[in-house]
Design a protein with these regions (language model features):
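Alpha-helical substrate-recognition element adjacent to the catalytic core
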Residues: 15-17, 27-181
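C-terminal cap/substrate-recognition subdomain and adjoining C-terminal extension
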Residues: 2, 151-171, 178-298
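Short, Φ-rich (hydrophobic/aromatic) sequence segments
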Residues: 1, 57-65, 259-263
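Residue-level detector of transmembrane insertion/anchoring sites
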Residues: 13-15, 219
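Generic structural signal of hydrophobic/aromatic residues within well-ordered alpha-helices
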Residues: 9, 63, 79-82, 101-112, ...
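The start of beta-strands in P-loop NTPase/AAA+ ATPase cores
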Residues: 18-20, 224
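Short, acidic, Ser/Thr-enriched surface-loop or helix-capping motifs
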Residues: 23
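A short, compositionally biased domain-edge/stem linker segment
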Residues: 2-11
Length: 298
């Protein structure tokens, strides 16, 4: 299945001179906080019996997934990083709760580029690894919980206007590490799926691969733009020599209004690269720390 999805990305042909990739969770839709706090983190606590250290699990997982330079990371590396940080916390060490090393997960992530449930299911069937099976069960329950909990969460203001305006001169692609099923459901629920040429999720590969397959070599480099709210979006753009427009966490509406009123026009006019883009990225970098707040205070 993943191979077919990748081939669909590769087969996309330009209909316009410009290309824009758009992240979804926390960028287009205000879903990131509710998904993490009400779906991902409670299921972690339940699956690994972390009730005794639940406050530290929530704080650590929120730092990794929402309030740090790792914001927007694929769920599997984010889980691994959360566990690594938990093991370093004195409160967790003193609790006597065992936080697994996730050795099998680390090995699988080194071997696999399409970090999604289909690839993990295949690995579990092939290996019978109990650690990977537990992580797969967690991931599947997260998806079920999201489907039950996340409904009616609107897009940020100025998103729809921006995409309508952008689509007049650019080919648009959703570039996300959310599972495809959830992406398609959310974009369709808000009647926005028709605004983009295609929706790419974690089953299509990394965000860097999405841009590479869909845009690199098909458009002039300064005609390719990635819009995102996380450092991974910036890295994907830089890896493909593309431009980047950041949606600032906590100031999403202001970011989209600025894009609608000036950023998009600059992109089409060829004046986005250079000082204007650098200012946007510098402001973005200041928002997301790499050191956890509990490390600073200890």
């Amino acid at each position: 299945m993943s191979h077919d999805l990748v081939e669909r990305l590769r087969a996309l042909q330009p209909k316009s001179k410009f290309f824009i990739g758009i992240d979804s969770d926390g960028c287009v839709f205000d879903t990131m906080e509710i998904k993490q706090k009400q779906c991902f983190h409670p299921v972690i606590i339940r699956h690994w019996n972390f009730e005794a250290i639940a406050p530290y699990v929530r704080e650590t997982a929120q730092f990794v997934n929402l309030y740090s330079r790792w914001r927007g990371t694929n769920r599997f590396p984010a889980l691994d990083m959360t566990f690594d940080l938990l093991r370093q916390r004195p409160e967790v060490q003193q609790s006597g709760v065992d936080v697994p090393e996730l050795t099998s997960l680390k090995r699988w992530m080194r071997e696999e580029s399409r970090l999604g449930n289909p690839a993990l299911e295949a690995k579990v069937k092939e290996s019978g690894d109990p650690e990977l099976e537990k992580i797969l069960e967690w991931s599947l329950e997260v998806n079920r919980t999201i489907e039950e909990v996340v409904h009616g969460v609107e897009s940020f203001d100025f998103v729809r206007e921006s995409l309508n305006k952008a689509g007049q001169r650019a080919d648009l692609l959703v570039v996300s590490q959310t599972p495809l099923e959830a992406l398609e459901r959310e974009w369709k629920e808000h009647a926005m799926d028709g605004l983009v040429a295609m929706i790419a999720g974690q089953e299509h590969g990394t965000k860097t691969e999405h841009l590479e397959y869909a845009a690199s070599g098909k458009y002039a480099k300064d005609h390719i733009l990635m819009i995102g709210d996380a450092p991974g979006d910036l890295k994907a753009a830089q890896a493909n020599d593309a431009l980047f427009y950041p949606v600032l966490p906590g100031e999403e509406t202001r970011s989209w209004e600025k894009f609608y009123r000036e950023g998009l026009d600059r992109f089409f006019e060829g004046t986005y690269a250079g000082a204007y883009q650098e200012e946007r990225i510098e402001e973005f970098d200041r928002r997301l720390p790499s050191v956890p707040p509990w490390s600073k205070s200890s």
